[in-house]
Design a protein with these regions (language model features):
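Outer-membrane beta-barrel translocator/channel fold
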Residues: 98-163, 274-293, 297, 303-305, ...
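C-terminal outer-membrane beta-barrel translocator/porin domains of Gram-negative envelope proteins
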Residues: 97, 222-325, 330
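Outer-membrane beta-barrel initiation region
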Residues: 22-123, 197-227, 324-330, 341-342, ...
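Outer-membrane beta-barrel "beta-signal"
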Residues: 212-213, 357-362, 367, 382-393
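Transmembrane beta-barrel domains of outer membrane proteins
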Residues: 77-79, 112-114, 160-164, 174, ...
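Membrane-embedded beta-strand positions in outer-membrane beta-barrel channels/transporters
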Residues: 58, 73-75, 92-94, 108-110, ...
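Transmembrane beta-barrel strands of outer-membrane/channel proteins
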Residues: 63-65, 74-78, 93-99, 124-140, ...
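Transmembrane beta-strand segments of outer-membrane beta-barrel domains in Gram-negative
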Residues: 24-46, 55-58, 125-127, 133-263, ...
């Protein structure tokens, strides 16, 4: 019953009047970082060429203090078209290795591929992580007093393939594989931690493998920095294993809508609703829904990643994006989000956690409309600072 209520909330969240949409076009008077670099190394009257190519690259090596752990992130993003731009959506591949001073090493590759005329869509998530992270217990009432550090290594291989049915509607299957190794925990509390109690003191390696049925609707023209359209993804996962051999299932719904308010300037209102729950068995502790651990890792600006964890997560976010300069080089965003994890082993969302924040945008590559993204979010007793080359959603 609780699952049904959450789905109804997500449905009505997107039944709002549409503003007119704006195509993700690039005008001649737009400027980006590559234009600035080109001017520095070429004659003043020279004009940057090569803008008609179907492929665009962005590379960003930057030291960053993200979620209170300093480190270095190197973000590489490439976008391209596998067919006519009028009939084929943009594809992208992102590689963002991250190294922190708290001994976190993350090597993620994410792909979002459209074949010619959008006949097929392939979504991939592949990563290797050595990832000691703070964990705060299970359920909505967890506090820093319950914190411990969970250290582990993870291999992930997620691959979805969907086929065009009609228009922007698609359906397909996915294979999802996670392997957790060398798990250990350093506790800062007296007594047993939630991890220890949930896993019955088991720190052995664990493998999760599942098959997912995916329904997808995507009317965006640019998935790096959308200005119009809608994205709705619904996954139903059937996992073949679980803790104590108890197989489990999950529902994963991600819905996003974009409204443009100007044909000349970048003025976009974007909002998102996200629901993730597990049921029917016992997933590994690290497979449970957690803030910041959606597939893109971008929920929960204003919170430390992994701050809240339970068997169900509900999340809403809104953001206003705007140009500051007329040539689109400088921009800004203002965002707010609110989330809740259920009381553990129920679907009761009684405690909500709000956050607000703002961000700076610098046009990195006008070919794919990518920005240098710097976002600062704040919430009660927590904050986050995030950097990247694509919008948060």
């Amino acid at each position: 019953m609780k699952n049904t209520k959450c789905l109804i909330v997500l449905f009505f969240f997107f039944l709002m009047p549409f503003c007119y949409s704006q195509t993700d076009s690039i005008t001649n008077n737009k400027r980006d970082i590559l234009d600035v670099l080109y001017k520095l190394f070429h004659k003043n009257d020279s004009v940057r060429t090569g803008m008609d190519k179907k492929i665009a690259f962005s590379l960003l090596p930057v030291p960053i203090n993200a979620d209170k752990s300093g480190g270095l992130v190197v973000s590489f993003l490439t976008s391209f078209y596998l067919g006519d731009e009028k009939t084929t959506n943009m594809s992208q591949i992102t590689f963002s290795p991250y190294f922190s001073f708290t001994n976190q090493y993350v090597f993620p590759i994410q792909t979002y591929i459209y074949t010619k005329d959008n006949h097929w869509n392939f979504i991939g998530d592949y990563r290797f992580m050595i990832y000691p992270q703070d964990t705060y217990g299970l359920g909505g009432n967890n506090t820093a007093d319950e914190m411990s550090t969970l250290d582990y290594q993870q291999w992930r291989f997620y691959q979805f393939a969907t086929r065009k049915i009609v228009g922007n509607y698609r359906a397909g299957l996915g294979l999802l594989y996670d392997n957790y190794q060398n798990i250990s925990e350093e506790s800062f509390i007296d007594g047993e931690t939630d991890y220890y109690k949930y896993m019955n003191g088991d720190f052995s390696n664990e493998t999760s493998f599942g098959v997912a049925f995916q329904g997808l609707y995507d009317s965006r023209e640019n998935n790096v920095n959308p200005e119009q359209g809608m994205y709705i993804e619904a996954d139903y996962r059937i996992n073949t294993s679980g803790v104590e051999g108890k197989k489990w299932n999950s529902i994963y719904i991600d819905a996003r809508k974009y409204h443009s308010f100007s044909k000349q300037r970048h003025k976009v209102l974007a909002y998102r609703a996200f629901y993730w729950s597990t049921f029917g068995g016992k997933p590994h502790y690290l497979d449970l829904p957690s803030i910041g651990w959606d597939r893109d890792g971008k929920t929960g600006r204003g919170f430390t990643r992994n701050r809240f964890r339970s068997n169900a997560l509900l999340y809403f976010e809104g953001e206003y994006r705007m140009d500051i300069s007329k040539n689109g080089f400088w921009g800004a965003v203002f965002f707010t989000n609110i989330s809740s994890v259920s009381k553990f082993d129920t679907y009761d969302f009684s405690k909500w956690n709000p956050a607000v924040g703002t961000g700076l945008r610098i046009k990195f590559n006008k070919k794919n409309n990518s920005n240098l993204v710097l976002d600062y979010g704040i919430s009660k007793n927590d904050w986050s600072l995030r950097l990247g080359l694509s919008e948060n959603f």
